[in-house]
Amino acid sequence: MLILLRLSEVCVNFVIIIGIPLLIEASILCIQNILELLLKGIGILKFNRYLHTIILRLFFLSFYMLHFPITLSILAFQLPLNLLTLSQASFHLPRSHMILYQQQECY
């Protein structure tokens, strides 16, 4: 009984850890949509994807900062981890998450 209780506790903790970033991302997207509607309503929305670009950059930067040791062990396993700095390790990050959107002006 105690083993099942511990196992369910581990599963719940795992679900909470996985669910928190998704909840944060959903709330950020809601705030982004509200801000875009307000800006569009008063007519000063100049950059269509600018806010989305900033949020994506911050989200993926925080993701890699939180998972930095895991990312380093996967991507640079042949190098000692204590010799790598963040600027050296950022070279090894996947390029698919570093796509920058071109800013477009709406007239």
Swiss-Prot record:
- Under the cellular component aspect of Gene Ontology, which terms does the record hold? mitochondrial membrane; mitochondrion
Where is this protein found?
Mitochondrion membrane
- Keywords recorded for this protein, A-Z: Membrane, Mitochondrion, Transmembrane, Transmembrane helix
Q: Which residues cross the membrane?
A: 11-31, 58-78
Induction pattern: Down-regulated in the absence of SIT4.
For membrane topology, the record states: Multi-pass membrane protein
UniProt key word Cell cycle: no
Main location per the UniProt record:
mitochondrion
Q: What is this protein called?
A: Uncharacterized protein YER181C, mitochondrial
Give the originating organism: Saccharomyces cerevisiae (strain ATCC 204508 / S288c)
